[in-house]
Amino acid sequence: METTTTKKPYEVVVLMHPDASLEEQKDLFKKNKATIESYKGSINSLETWGKRTLATPIGKLKKAIYFHSTFEADTQAIAELERTMRINDKVLRFMHTRLDERTSLGKFMEGFKKGLAESAAREKEREAKAAARKAAFAAAKAERSERYDKGE
């Protein structure tokens, strides 16, 4: 009986130890690329999001290096990728997510980047409003302080 394996689209987010060297980071993704290609898969994109603060600490670590990748592979490749990432001490967390097969990876990445840009714009807007509130509060406090000094 012949089994056919079909490539399915996936994305993965990997959190690496903040002290991981550039060489260790490259080695991990070279191994991942080799694993995917050995199962006749292909990598669509790999992005480094850099060192970011974690929402909740992992052990005593408050920061991690984030990576995001999209690729096509079969389920056996995913099992092997997860096995190798569990072994690697520098990988703190990872999550593979199977994407909708009806959407091409290119379209997915366009939508993903658009969502990131919108999220960043909302965050900037929130920060600007917070800064304006802080400035208004400081001005009101200074005014009250002046009136108090004058004895009003």
UniProtKB/Swiss-Prot annotation:
Name of the gene encoding the protein in the UniProt record: rpsF
Name of the protein described by the UniProt record: Small ribosomal subunit protein bS6
UniProt keywords, alphabetically: Ribonucleoprotein, Ribosomal protein, RNA-binding, rRNA-binding
Any single GO BP term: translation
Record lineage: Bacteria, Pseudomonadati, Bdellovibrionota, Bdellovibrionia, Bdellovibrionales
CDD domains linked to this entry: bS6 (cd00473)
Family annotation (Pfam families): Ribosomal_S6
Family the UniProt entry places it in: Belongs to the bacterial ribosomal protein bS6 family.
Domain of life: Bacteria
Keyword RNA-binding assigned: yes
Matching InterPro entries: Ribosomal_bS6 (IPR000529), Ribosomal_bS6_sf (IPR035980), Ribosomal_S6_plastid/chlpt (IPR020814), Transl_elong_EF1B/ribsomal_bS6 (IPR014717)
Organism: Bdellovibrio bacteriovorus (strain ATCC 15356 / DSM 50701 / NCIMB 9529 / HD100)
Single GO molecular function: small ribosomal subunit rRNA binding
Keyword Cell division: no
GO CC terms, sorted: cytoplasm; ribonucleoprotein complex; ribosome
Purpose: Binds together with bS18 to 16S ribosomal RNA.
NCBIfam families: S6
